[in-house]
From Swiss-Prot:
The gene is rplV. Pfam families: Ribosomal_L22. It comes from the Bacteria. Part of the 50S ribosomal subunit. This is Large ribosomal subunit protein uL22. The keyword DNA-binding does not apply. NCBIfam families: rplV_bact.
Amino acid sequence: MQAKAILRHTPTSPRKMRLVAGLVRGKRVDQAKAILHNSTKSASRNVMVTLKSAVANWSQLNPDERLNDNELFVKAIFVDEGPSLKRLLPAPMGRAYRIRKRSNHLTIVVDKVENKVTK
């Protein structure tokens, strides 16, 4: 059974958040936490919080199963664009430049690692 966590309206550009999301896609949860802990990107803190929330959601959905972080993996992680705040910056000759302060929505899905037996 898989569990999902969503972080909405994060004030980070989706392009910057996707760089961090690509680092942990498909990794086991313990590996993903180690990667995020050692990352220098500011977006890694938001990904770490959402990953911990997804693991907690999984344990709530499966109260009879006790798994370590190395038995769960990041099944899916994706970043969608959120609403943009539009601001004006004064420019020369009476003009104005538009500044778009972007935001994003982060979704993480975790699932149990299936041990496949080869014959």
